[in-house]
A protein has these predicted regions:
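Extracellular receptor-binding modules and their adjoining Ser/Thr/Gly/Asp/Asn-rich linkers
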Residues: 311-365
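Short, solvent-exposed secondary-structure boundary motifs
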Residues: 118, 223, 251-266, 327-351, ...
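Extracellular/surface-exposed low-complexity segments
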Residues: 304-312
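Short, polar loop/linker segments at the starts of domains and inter-domain junctions
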Residues: 6-15, 111-115, 287-300, 322-339
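Glycine- and small/polar-enriched repetitive beta-structure motifs of secreted/surface proteins
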Residues: 1-284, 301-304
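Low-complexity, small-hydrophobic/phenylalanine-enriched stretches
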Residues: 121, 271, 282, 303, ...
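Low-complexity, glycine- and small/polar-enriched segments
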Residues: 5, 9, 13, 361-366, ...
Length: 393
């Protein structure tokens, strides 16, 4: 009746508290300025206000604007539909977003009137998420980037109304979608990227970081280890302090005068296990395939097999051995010199085409004298000499 209406209006006038929506609950304390304004809303505490239909604001200066949103704590803000803000000075602005802890912000006002931070969550302290479907667990993490401006908006009614600083995206673009940061003071300004560690930075899409003080500036790159750095697309840095460099193609090499073409001549990127001055060995590598088309890594035992065969050298054998020799054969290793001595050292006193070398097709070369000798100046056999002047006995 009129008595109830007057009493209700008197409560609003005296306490700056109200229950304006249907099926709403307003519970006030000694310093209440609490308002459950939307339909089916609940506001409990001091300076708390529930605007969104089915929303709940509990605590001190908590504000819920989103439909079915919940804000519990001190200075919580739940603006997104089905959003949750739980803690102290936390904001859940995106639809179905969650902000739990202390001084977290999830989402922004977009230029078109929508909100970023959809289905994102921050748990911990001083985390900021601009992107959609992004997650931050820890402290001081930042996911996403945007060109923003800050305005001031009054919230609430009566003398207890407060003012919120509203961060608005001015260019309509937000990075940091579907990304995640777990740790302390990590920064991600890219989509589909993840960081686990502390003080690491990712500024390229599709990147992965596991470590502290790491940096990734190239797409689809991976950094594993502390103080790693990846600046090349699709590259991988493994181990503390590792840094990547641009991949270098090696199509062929000339060995002993012969050109050998290689497989895998168009590398997509590179894997680094150190940096200049801090190189590492790679151990426990399985034997790779050996062929003209193989791109497998080769381990030390395979190289040993090659060098051990080369160390065997080449064996040379004669029909007989010299009186001072122990055998009629000897072995020379790769790079060692073999001397073949005929006796005559003046090339002008040598003939041509009087000796032939015949192979048996397996392992023997036979040196034979021509049946018809040409280009000779003289032939001496014992005391007999044949030359251009005739026969001398």
């Amino acid at each position: 009746g009129n008595g109830i209406k007057k009493s209700f209006n008197k409560e609003i006038e005296d306490k700056f508290a109200g229950t304006l929506g249907s099926a709403s609950i307003n519970v006030k304390g000694k310093y209440a300025n609490t308002a459950a304004i939307g339909d089916a809303t609940t506001a409990i505490g001091t300076l708390s206000e529930a605007y969104g239909t089915g929303s709940t604001a509990i605590g001190i200066n908590s504000l819920t604007k989103g439909v079915a949103s919940t804000g519990i704590g001190i200075m919580t803000r739940s603006w997104g539909t089905n959003s949750l803000a739980l803690g102290t000075q936390v904001g859940a602005y995106g639809d179905r977003s969650s902000s739990i802890g202390d001084t977290n912000q999830v989402g922004l006002d977009m230029k078109d009137g929508s909100k970023s931070g959809k289905e994102s969550a921050a748990v911990g302290s001083k985390n900021t998420i601009y992107g959609n479907q992004a997650y931050a667990i820890g402290a001081g993490n930042t996911i996403g980037s945007a060109t923003v401006m800050t305005t001031t908006e009054a919230n609430g009614s009566g003398a207890g109304a407060d003012q919120d600083k509203i961060t608005t995206v001015t260019d309509g673009t937000v990075k940091g979608n579907m990304s995640g940061a777990f740790g302390y003071k990590n920064s991600i300004t890219a989509d589909n990227s993840y960081v686990v560690g502390s003080n690491s930075n990712v500024s390229a899409d599709g990147a992965m970081v596991l470590g502290n003080n790491a940096s990734v500036t190239a797409k689809n790159a991976v950094a594993l280890g502390n103080n790693t750095k990846v600046d090349n697309e699709s590259a991988v840095a493994l181990g503390t302090g590792s840094e990547t460099a641009a991949a270098v193609a090696t199509p062929s090499a000339t060995i002993n005068g012969a050109v050998h073409n290689f497989a895998g001549i168009n590398p997509a990127s590179t894997v680094s296990v150190g940096k200049a001055g801090m190189e590492r060995t790679i151990t426990n590598v399985a034997a790779g395939r050996i062929s003209d088309t193989s791109t497998d890594a080769i381990n030390g035992s395979q190289l040993h097999a090659v060098t051990s065969e080369m160390d065997k050298g080449v064996a040379y054998a004669g029909d007989v051995k010299a009186a001072s020799a122990t055998a009629n054969k000897f072995t020379r290793k790769f790079g060692e010199q073999t001397n073949i001595v005929g006796g005559v050292t003046d090339p002008t006193k040598l003939s041509d085409n009087n000796i032939g070398v015949v192979s048996n097709g397996t392992d023997t070369l036979n040196v034979k004298l021509a049946k018809t000798l040409t280009g000779l100046e003289s032939v001496t056999a014992g005391s007999t000499t044949i030359n251009n002047d005739g026969l001398t006995v």
